[in-house]
């Protein structure tokens, strides 16, 4: 499992380069997804990997670890993620969000036993998740076409190009010991996937086309993220066409 996660960054960049070259371009009804044929192939590949390796591991993770332990793990990674969110809040000139996120980090690190407890939320310090893709969007960079990345899942061309910097800004990747980085990466994958077990099953059972459901949901969420929950009534995806809110 560790080996494919170590290769995920290069695979993601490869997908972005293929998109830039217009690989597998097809005419579709949705202007946001001009590479749907390629994206569906990658989506199916990700489904196979998930069903064979990631989902069973996440189910075992839930079975073995008590709920309070899993909550602590999620809080720990959330605290690490707040550091990069704080940086991007600053890059977006969001002064209050930057200060409050800094306060969250200090409160949870020192009063929450290294982030295992989310004391800051109890103190009503709002958690804001920001990344470099959102920062680019804040400064007017269009999302570009929808892209499904190998192993990493839904993205846009803008977010794919922002991915290397997001990875460099990930505090868990700053540990000098490679074994520690690998353990943290694997644990975070299990933490994220375990939290989606029921959601993914419901989507697959209820949707006639899970690919379309995931795509539309992801793009809507990213649009809301960029505009802090208040997106415009229409949105230009950089191809000359606008999509209604």
Where are these regions (language model features)?
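N-terminal, post-signal-peptide region of Sec/Tat-exported proteins
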Residues: 51-79
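A structured, mid-to-C-terminal "fold-capping" secondary-structure block
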Residues: 25-27, 134, 139-245
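Mid-length scaffold segments of soluble, non-membrane domains
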Residues: 79-157
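Post-signal peptide N-terminal segment of mature Sec-exported envelope proteins
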Residues: 30-60
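Bacterial N-terminal signal peptides that target proteins for export
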Residues: 1-12
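Surface-exposed patches in mature extracellular/periplasmic domains of secreted proteins
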Residues: 69-72, 92-99, 121-122, 225-232
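C-terminal motif of bacterial Sec signal peptides marking the signal peptidase cleavage site
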Residues: 19-22
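N-terminal post-signal-peptidase region of extra-cytosolic proteins
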Residues: 42, 62-73, 89-93, 100, ...
């Amino acid at each position: 499992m560790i080996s494919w996660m170590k290769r995920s960054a290069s695979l993601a960049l490869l997908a972005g380069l293929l998109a830039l070259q217009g690989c597998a371009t097809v005419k579709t009804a949705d202007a946001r997804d001009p590479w749907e044929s390629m994206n569906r192939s990658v989506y199916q590949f990700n489904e196979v990997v998930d069903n064979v390796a990631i989902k069973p591991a996440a189910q075992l993770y839930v079975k073995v670890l008590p709920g309070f332990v899993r909550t602590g793990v999620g809080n720990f990674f959330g605290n690490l993620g707040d550091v990069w969110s704080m940086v991007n809040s600053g890059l977006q000139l969001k002064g209050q969000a930057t200060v409050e996120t800094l306060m969250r980090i200090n409160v949870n690190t020192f009063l929450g036993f290294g982030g295992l407890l989310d004391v800051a939320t109890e103190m009503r310090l709002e958690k804001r998740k920001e990344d470099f893709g959102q920062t680019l969007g804040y400064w007017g960079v269009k999302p570009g076409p929808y892209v499904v990345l190998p192993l990493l899942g839904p993205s846009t061309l803008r977010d794919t190009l922002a991915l290397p910097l997001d990875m460099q800004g990930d505090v868990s990747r700053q540990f000098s010991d490679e074994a520690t980085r690998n353990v943290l990466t694997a644990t975070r994958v299990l933490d994220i996937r375990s939290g989606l077990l029921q959601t993914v099953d419901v989507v697959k059972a209820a949707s006639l086309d899970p690919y379309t459901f995931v795509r539309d949901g992801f793009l809507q969420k990213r649009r809301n993220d960029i505009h802090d929950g208040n997106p415009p009534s229409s949105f230009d995806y950089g191809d000359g066409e606008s999509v209604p809110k």
